[in-house]
């Protein structure tokens, strides 16, 4: 890494957080601009909120190690680079177009191992036709990752639709050597209790919110502290 990288890292007060960004910047060969973006979008806190207590502690020691489907998830995803505003009356197609127009930034936000495969991937059953918004492949997990974009609040029907997409890919697209398909619903708003009741515990389908602006760091830190306390952790662990 360059001296500019280390100047950026020196500004991070929390030792665990600084260690995480140093490991990731070196491993992923982030440029200074990439490092700045990941820090300013609070990647550390967002990854921590998507993991159990043990893996939160490992983030500062090993960085973001990808071994399971949950390791590639964030909640929320930060999509400030698309240039849309919450008040703007945009459609799912608008969001999809902006994501693909800024594919390099989107891949950075998605994280390790992702490659783009297709948009609006169509498949049919007799006379019924369906389309998956965005299809990616994760080479570390060796599986397809499907993204469905939802404007507004997530509905239980959306989860059922994604289950069908995942089932299709598992049965007709993936090979025997590949791992089960992951489905991610990106939505403005969601009811976590509804999602938990709708999906089985071993489901490979996830719902994550997206934000069109950089999140508030203190809000994420407070949320992480509260979650760690519920898990039996302590505030000084972050």
What positions do the PLM features span?
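Basic, low-complexity intrinsically disordered segments
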Residues: 1-238
């Amino acid at each position: 890494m360059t001296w500019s990288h280390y100047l950026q890292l020196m500004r991070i007060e929390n030792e665990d957080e600084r260690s995480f960004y140093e490991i990731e910047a070196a491993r992923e060969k982030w440029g200074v601009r990439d490092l700045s973006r990941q820090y300013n979008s609070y990647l550390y806190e967002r990854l921590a909120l998507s993991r159990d207590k043990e893996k939160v502690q490992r983030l500062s020691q090993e960085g973001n190690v990808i071994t399971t489907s949950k390791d590639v998830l964030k909640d929320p995803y930060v999509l400030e680079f698309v240039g849309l505003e919450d008040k703007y009356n945009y459609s799912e197609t608008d969001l999809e177009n902006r994501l693909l127009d800024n594919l390099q930034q989107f891949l950075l936000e998605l994280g390790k191992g992702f490659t783009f495969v297709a948009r609006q991937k169509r498949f049919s059953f007799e006379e019924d036709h369906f389309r998956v918004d965005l299809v990616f492949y994760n080479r570390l997990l060796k599986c397809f990752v499907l993204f469905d974009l939802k404007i507004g609040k997530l509905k239980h029907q959306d989860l059922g639709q994604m289950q069908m997409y995942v089932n299709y890919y598992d049965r007709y697209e993936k090979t025997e050597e590949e791992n089960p398909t992951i489905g991610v619903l990106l939505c403005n708003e969601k009811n976590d209790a509804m999602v938990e009741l709708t999906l089985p515990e071993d489901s490979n389908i996830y719902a994550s919110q997206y934000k069109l602006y950089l999140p508030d760091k203190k809000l994420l830190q407070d949320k992480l502290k509260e979650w760690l306390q519920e898990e039996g952790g302590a505030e000084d662990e972050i």
